[in-house]
């Protein structure tokens, strides 16, 4: 560990600067150069990267019980470290007893360091805690290198206190990348540690 007060740095960082997330550093040092070599990119701007992660929790039952949305917002805030936006119904649907403006879900969009820290926790801690987990499907890309998958319960995240769960809630997680093809997106996410099944 290098500590100097003259140059005002600690371990090569300016004093007061936040440490670079572990996965972001790995992407810069190892993953990006490996992808450049694998796909023979001429320009560094062609190397695919992660733009944002969107975590969405639908609460259809909130139409009948408004308190349920509070639990979803609390869980999502604990998992992501960011205050979720409450999503409301855009139109009324009588069959679902849904009126326009009713809260039906919560959503968080993560960018920057929070995004990298969330992805790191997701692949190293949360996904391995899923019961009978055999890997993620490699086919759920959208054709443009973005990946969406579902998680059936929030308890896989260690930020959630199992004793305080009022009900099991699933969520959809979308990883938006700058990749132009599914193969590029798959290679990027696999390098980041996403455990894809071998089909």
From Swiss-Prot:
Functional summary from the UniProt entry: This is one of the proteins that bind and probably mediate the attachment of the 5S RNA into the large ribosomal subunit, where it forms part of the central protuberance. In the 70S ribosome it contacts protein S13 of the 30S subunit (bridge B1b), connecting the 2 subunits; this bridge is implicated in subunit movement. Contacts the P site tRNA; the 5S rRNA and some of its associated proteins might help stabilize positioning of ribosome-bound tRNAs.
GO biological process, one term: translation
GO CC field: ribonucleoprotein complex; ribosome
Pfam families: Ribosomal_L5 (PF00281), Ribosomal_L5_C (PF00673)
InterPro entries: Ribosomal_uL5 (IPR002132), Ribosomal_uL5_bac-type (IPR020930), Ribosomal_uL5_C (IPR031309), Ribosomal_uL5_dom_sf (IPR022803), Ribosomal_uL5_N (IPR031310)
Name of the protein described by the UniProt record: Large ribosomal subunit protein uL5
Record NCBIfam families: PRK00010.1
Keyword annotations from UniProtKB, A to Z: Ribonucleoprotein, Ribosomal protein, RNA-binding, rRNA-binding, tRNA-binding
SUPFAM superfamilies, A to Z: RL5-like (SSF55282)
Gene Ontology MF annotations: rRNA binding; structural constituent of ribosome; tRNA binding
Family label: Belongs to the universal ribosomal protein uL5 family.
Matches recorded under PANTHER family: 60S RIBOSOMAL PROTEIN L11-RELATED
Subunit structure: Part of the 50S ribosomal subunit; part of the 5S rRNA/L5/L18/L25 subcomplex. Contacts the 5S rRNA and the P site tRNA. Forms a bridge to the 30S subunit in the 70S ribosome.
UniProt xrefs under HAMAP family: Ribosomal_uL5_B
């Amino acid at each position: 560990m290098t500590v100097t007060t003259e140059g005002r740095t600690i371990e090569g960082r300016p004093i007061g600067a936040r440490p670079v997330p572990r996965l972001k550093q790995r992407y810069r040092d190892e993953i990006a150069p490996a992808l450049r070599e694998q796909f023979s990119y001429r320009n560094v701007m062609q190397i695919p990267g992660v733009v944002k992660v969107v975590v969405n929790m639908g609460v259809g039952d909130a139409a009948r019980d408004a308190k349920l949305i509070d639990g979803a917002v609390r869980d999502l805030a604990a998992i992501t470290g960011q205050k979720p936006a409450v999503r409301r119904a855009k139109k009324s649907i009588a069959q679902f007893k849904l009126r326009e403006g009713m809260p039906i879900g919560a959503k968080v969009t993560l960018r920057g360091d929070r995004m990298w820290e969330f992805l790191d926790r997701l692949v190293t801690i949360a996904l391995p805690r899923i019961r009978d987990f055999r890997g993620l499907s490699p086919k759920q890309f959208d054709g443009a290198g973005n990946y969406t998958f579902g998680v059936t319960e929030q308890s896989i995240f260690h930020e959630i206190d199992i004793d305080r769960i009022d009900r099991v809630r699933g969520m959809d997680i979308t990883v938006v990348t700058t990749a132009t093809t599914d193969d590029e997106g798959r290679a990027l996410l696999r390098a980041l540690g996403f455990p894809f099944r071998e089909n």
